[in-house]
């Protein structure tokens, strides 16, 4: 199935997409109007669609669930809306893609509530505002079995 996502990265965003794909872990420090959220939402979508894993799981995590909804949910729906057989779960802020991939938007306000999840890829937005244990104690173990670069 040929899928066209309605997103054209700017020059520096295209560079980042390329570099992120070459590394296991990436940290981006970009100016306020760089387009980080749109860039990373589209990176998650592409990674989920191209994943060779069976039913891959991806997450976008911001400091709070409310922030994920207000900042990223509309973008997620906008950029996946034209993908045939895509399903949206408004309550859980989840997109189920036709290849079995799932992208969920999460909040880190109860980081212990994220323990035990499995992830193939993840984006943490506003990293300075999440609990310091989120990545080393919760997200890194969730990604430990995955070799996907995101």
Describe the residue ranges of each PLM region.
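Phosphate/NTP-binding elements of NTP-utilizing enzymes
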Residues: 1-148
